[in-house]
Amino acid sequence: MAARKVLTRAESQAQTRQELLDAAEQLFYANGYHATSLAAIAAEAGRTIGAVYSNFEGKEALCLEVIRNRSMAELNQLLGPLVAAGVSTDDRLAALASWWARIGAEPNLVVLTAEYVTSTFHNPDQLAKAREALERFKESTRVLLEDAVPEGVPADHPLMDDAIEVAVATGAGIAMAQALGTIDAERGAALMVANMRLWFDALVVGK
């Protein structure tokens, strides 16, 4: 039998941290932010409360890390289809629609984000960290948008910042509407594509 690998201190801590994040995501999604305690997360991960606090400042920080990791993972899932779509704007928008329809059918992330924001809104430190996470998300959105826009549109286009802000804000609004059940994932995808097509046209005209 092969010898079991002995983890370094850093590897062991990274493993513990990931196990806590996985457990937190599972419980936050299943029970909601408010109903999930750190004790429950620690138990689900097979760890102690001390392990939680040695990796995260508290429940708010743990939740924000879950949101940040899942948001970036979902955004990264769009990169491959966009690249595979080639230079066709219609194909790129079709890739966006398919991606949005998939994530729109799973409202857990947007619901958790809403719970986190309302719970920490009056906490200046957590609000600052949430804003920092949002800025990083928008930076990643910029990378994807620069790949998705029609050929010939420069990355430093004067309307690019506006396009990113509107894309993120519109996406958040549509995602919330889907979570509330006022529109379905297919309709949400169609609205996202329509919005992006308008911006693509504006970028082309103004280049």
Language-model segments: what does each one mean?
Residues 127-131, 148-207:
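Hydrophobic/aromatic-rich alpha-helical bundle segments in the mid-to-C-terminal region
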Residues 81, 85, 120-121, 178-182:
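Secondary-structure edge/capping motif, primarily at the C-terminal ends of alpha-helices
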Residues 12-25, 41, 66-70, 74, ...:
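Generic hydrophobic, amphipathic alpha-helix propensity
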Residues 13, 21, 67, 127-138, ...:
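Amphipathic, non-transmembrane alpha-helical scaffold segments
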Residues 65, 79-110, 155, 160-167, ...:
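Hydrophobic alpha-helical connector segments
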Residues 1-15, 149, 204-207:
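N-terminal intrinsically disordered/low-complexity leader segments
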